[in-house]
Swiss-Prot record:
Keywords: Aminoacyl-tRNA synthetase, ATP-binding, Cytoplasm, Ligase, Nucleotide-binding, Protein biosynthesis, RNA-binding. It is found in: Cytoplasm. The lineage of its organism: Bacteria, Pseudomonadati, Chlamydiota, Chlamydiia, Chlamydiales. L-tyrosine binds at residues 31, 162, 166. This is Tyrosine--tRNA ligase. It comes from Chlamydia pneumoniae (Chlamydophila pneumoniae). CDD domains: S4, TyrRS_core. It catalyses: tRNA(Tyr) + L-tyrosine + ATP = L-tyrosyl-tRNA(Tyr) + AMP + diphosphate + H(+). Homodimer. Its EC number is 6.1.1.1. Belongs to the class-I aminoacyl-tRNA synthetase family. TyrS type 1 subfamily. The gene is tyrS. InterPro entries: aa-tRNA-synth_Ic, Rossmann-like_a/b/a_fold, S4_RNA-bd, S4_RNA-bd_sf, Tyr-tRNA-ligase, Tyr-tRNA-ligase_bac-type, Tyr-tRNA-ligase_bac_1. Disulfide bonds: none annotated. It is an enzyme of class 6 (ligase).
Length: 412
């Protein structure tokens, strides 16, 4: 087995690969696709970005493909129902933004857009020169298509054709860039093998495929969402603090997989994490989360996240800016009430209204134990009320029950 493939296998990030890849000698070019279904990349895309970076470090020539054409069709992989089609202008705008993002994260990597070749193919040419090489029987047994065909909603011809378009991408890159390997998440295996078969039918030679595991929880659901929605790599959509807190809140048993897929730590460092996570999962999770955050947002983004995190500890509020409060509120830690409903009211009653405690008995006990905080200061007693001086920047109050359960109250 080639050393680069063995390195991926030792890291336990090989889900599947086609027979013969382990024996390929000489330079290898590999590609991975990113469809512009949104104006930014999300945490799931970071797996692919790290994978391309890792391939480059192992001597493979990486190519990143932006799906300017396939993004207008929609990949049915992993979807229970059909995607809503985006306007052409949206896909174009998204493609430009994602290309810029990939250029920042993957400097020096070749970037291509499949709109450059797919939009040049006429319908007749598509049916005659491409479609005739695909057999319905083979397409219908692909897991993604089979599941959708037998679902209540079914699958449209548009999404059914996605597999053919992705196969043509592989053919185009094989023919024009010498790209013999396509990589992707485990849900892309059917699309990848169809491309390999298409290249063989066109008489170009042997192509290969490789998939890595998706980031999932114990129930097999994709990880990558919070209460407020998708976890984006764009700091304007998901702040560094939100991303950091999201990573810290992931279950301890996901740490080894996160370290393998979302970082560029060496295999030796990964093995060390496997050992340390058994005895000190909190410290290991913080280490891994900070490594990821630094890679995505740089040292300044990491320091911003750590600064806000420190400010939320009891006794530390002064460094929280109005922007920090807004991001905490918008990031799923917020609730809003009219100021008239809060001023002069007992905090004991407000904590119940906001769901931070289950009963007055519970909150009285916590107040006695100095476990209820307003702006990181313990509530003096159960008769304490909300006063104007408790409101930061005219709108915000930071409430906490214990050290971990926190809420930013926005007053209208």
């Amino acid at each position: 087995m080639q050393s680069w493939l063995q390195s991926l296998q030792e890291r336990n990030i090989l889900e599947n690969f086609t027979a013969g890849l382990e024996s390929v000698e000489g330079p290898i070019a590999a590609y991975l696709g990113f469809d512009p279904t949104a104006p930014a990349l999300h945490i799931g895309h970071w797996i692919g970005i790290c994978f391309l970076k890792r391939l480059a470090a192992l001597g493979i020539t990486p190519i990143a493909l932006v799906g300017g054409a396939t993004g207008m069709v929609g990949d049915p992989s992993g979807k229970q129902s059909e995607r809503s089609l985006l306007q052409t202008s949206e896909v174009f705008d998204n493609s430009q933004k994602i290309t810029a993002c990939l250029q920042r994260y993957l400097p020096g990597v070749t970037l291509v857009n499949n709109a450059d070749w797919l939009q040049e193919i006429s319908l007749i040419d598509f049916l005659r020169d491409i479609g005739k090489h695909f057999r319905l029987g083979q397409m219908l047994v692909k897991d993604t298509i089979k599941q959708r065909v037998h679902s209540d909603e079914g699958i449209s011809y548009t999404e059914f054709s996605y597999l053919i378009l992705q196969s043509y991408d592989f053919y185009h890159l094989f023919k024009n860039y010498g790209t013999i390997l396509q990589c992707g998440g485990s849900d892309q295996w059917g699309n990848i093998t169809s491309g390999i078969d298409f290249i063989r039918r066109k008489g170009l030679g042997q192509a290969y495929g490789l998939t890595y595991p998706l980031l999932t929880n114990a129930q097999g659901k994709k990880i990558g969402k919070t209460e407020s929605g998708t976890v984006w790599l764009d700091s304007d959509l998901t702040s560094p603090f939100e991303l950091y807190q999201y990573l810290l809140r992931l279950p301890d048993d996901t740490i080894p997989k996160i370290a393998r897929t979302l970082t560029l730590l060496s295999n030796e460092e990964i093995q060390d994490i496997d050992r340390r996570v058994q005895t000190d999962p909190v410290a290991v999770k913080e280490f891994v989360a900070q490594d990821i955050l630094s890679a995505i947002h740089g040292d300044l983004g990491l320091e911003e996240a750590l600064s806000v995190t420190r400010s939320m500890h009891p006794g530390n509020l002064s460094s929280l800016s109005e922007k920090d409060f807004h991001e905490l509120f918008a990031g799923g830690m917020g609730a809003s009430l009219d100021k008239s409903e809060v001023l002069g009211k007992r905090w004991l009653d407000l904590f119940l209204v906001l769901g931070l405690c289950k009963s007055k008995g519970e909150i009285r006990r916590l107040i006695e134990q100095k476990g209820v905080y307003i702006n990181n200061v313990p509530i003096a007693n159960e008769h304490s009320v909300c006063e104007e001086q408790d409101i930061c920047y005219g709108h915000y109050v930071l409430l906490a029950q214990g050290k971990k359960r926190k809420l930013v109250l926005y007053l209208n």
